[in-house]
Amino acid sequence: ASNFTQFVLVNDGGTGNVTVAPSNFANGVAEWISSNSRSQAYKVTCSVRQSSAQNRKYTIKVEVPKVATQTVGGVELPVAAWRSYLNLELTIPIFATNSDCELIVKAMQGLLKDGNPIPSAIAANSGIY
C-alpha cells in the first residue's frame, strides 16, 4: 500500500482544515501541495536517503504561507505576503527495528503536541522561558 496519499496538514476544527495532496515525486523527493493557487499553497516535501553506510536520513520540509491579496491594475491577485519554513532532519540507524521507528514517531508527535513547551512557544510567538 502506498503512503503517498493526501492528508490533513492543518487540523483547524473542520472548517479551516488544510489538506495537501500528492503533486510530484521526482528524484526521490515526494511533494504534497494544498489546493490553493500555487502562490498561496501550503507545501510539504519528504525525502529518504542513505546518509552513510549505517544511517538513513529523512529530510522533511513544510512551507506555511501568510495568505493575502494584492491589487494589480484593479484586479485582486492571490499572493503570499510571506512564508514560514520548517526543516526537519531525522537520522535513523539502518539496524533500527520497526518498533524502534514507531517509538521515534511517538517522540516526534509528543514534541509537537498541543500544550507542550515548543509548540506553545511558537504559537505565542515567543521563546522558551
Curated annotation (Swiss-Prot):
Example of a GO biological process term: regulation of translation
GO CC entries: T=3 icosahedral viral capsid
One MF annotation (Gene Ontology) recorded for this entry: structural molecule activity
Compartment(s): Virion
InterPro entries associated with the record: Levivir_coat, Phage_RNA-type_capsid
Claim: RNA-binding is one of the keywords in the record: yes
Cross-referenced Gene3D superfamilies: MS2 Viral Coat Protein
Assembly and oligomerization: Homodimer. The capsid proteins form dimers that assemble by group of 5. Twelve such pentamers are linked together with free dimers. The homodimers binds to the viral RNA via an operator hairpin, but also to many other RNA sequences in the viral genome; this interaction probably shifts the virus from the replicative to the assembly phase and ensures specific encapsidation of the viral genome.
Free-text function comment from the UniProt entry: Capsid protein self-assembles to form an icosahedral capsid with a T=3 symmetry, about 26 nm in diameter, and consisting of 89 capsid proteins dimers (178 capsid proteins). Involved in viral genome encapsidation through the interaction between a capsid protein dimer and the multiple packaging signals present in the RNA genome. The capsid also contains 1 copy of the A2 maturation protein. Acts as a translational repressor of viral replicase synthesis late in infection. This latter function is the result of capsid protein interaction with an RNA hairpin which contains the replicase ribosome-binding site.
Family according to the record: Belongs to the Leviviricetes capsid protein family.
The protein's name in its UniProt record: Capsid protein
Organism: Enterobacteria phage f2
